[in-house]
């Protein structure tokens, strides 16, 4: 990064950048968040150091390599970067990310989403990892403070799209979140065990006490577990 002391311009390289057409009317934060998490998300500590240096400068304009030149309300953009780079929670709500082979895990997820809304959750976001943009799913995980992972046991492991998703979280230093889990398996469900093992490198994760174990399809027992998770 370079600071022009004469015109008070910060040439921020990849920082504060985003993709997209400049003539499109769209919210800056949505694409900028995806861009940041995808490219810089792993390096929050380094971004924090840069922000500390930037705080001492009189910045009037920010010029990134990609995206619009920022000239107004710079505190808004700097504030978002502070949130993202410190792995803090940006938005209140619960994210549910799932994979479903025959539709039964999806039914459980949809029931959970409805229960969460009934219990007063301000926002519930549901992502089907097999059909959604994976980069946007990862972005959402860094946006919300609470996330539920729901997947099937597959070849004594977890369904590939969930594995890819969790790998995307871990390599970007996913942390400071509350995580709930739902597993589905016919005779030996072990998705929760696998997911927790994958997330071991992540810092400051709090796991919900209530976990949901589905044996192929929801029954009375797993429905009770689902309700307990929603209440938690």
Which positions does each model-derived feature cover?
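FMN-binding flavodoxin-like domain, especially the glycine-rich phosphate-binding loop
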Residues: 19-62, 66-69, 111-127, 137-232
């Amino acid at each position: 990064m370079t600071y022009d002391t004469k015109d008070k311009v910060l040439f921020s390289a990849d920082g504060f950048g985003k993709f997209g057409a400049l003539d499109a009317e769209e919210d800056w934060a949505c694409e900028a968040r995806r861009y940041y998490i995808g490219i810089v998300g792993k390096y929050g500590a380094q971004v924090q150091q840069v922000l500390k240096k930037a705080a001492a400068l009189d910045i009037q304009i920010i010029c990134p390599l990609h995206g619009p030149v920022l000239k107004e309300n710079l505190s808004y953009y700097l504030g978002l970067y502070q949130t993202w780079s410190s792995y803090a929670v940006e938005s209140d709500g619960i994210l549910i990310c799932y994979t479903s082979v025959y539709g039964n895990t999806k039914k459980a997820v949809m029931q959970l989403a409805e229960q969460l809304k009934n219990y007063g959750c301000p926002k519930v976001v549901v992502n089907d990892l097999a059909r959604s943009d994976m980069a946007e799913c990862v972005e959402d995980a860094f946006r919300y403070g609470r996330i539920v992972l729901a997947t099937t046991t597959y070849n004594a492991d977890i369904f590939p799209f969930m594995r890819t998703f969790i790998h995307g979280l871990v390599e970007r230093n996913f942390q400071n979140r509350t995580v709930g889990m739902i597993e589905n398996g016919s005779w030996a469900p072990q998705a929760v065990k696998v997911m927790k093992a994958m997330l071991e490198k992540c810092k400051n994760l709090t796991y919900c006490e209530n976990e949901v174990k589905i044996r192929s399809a929801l029954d009375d027992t797993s429905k009770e577990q689902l309700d307990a998770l929603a209440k938690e």
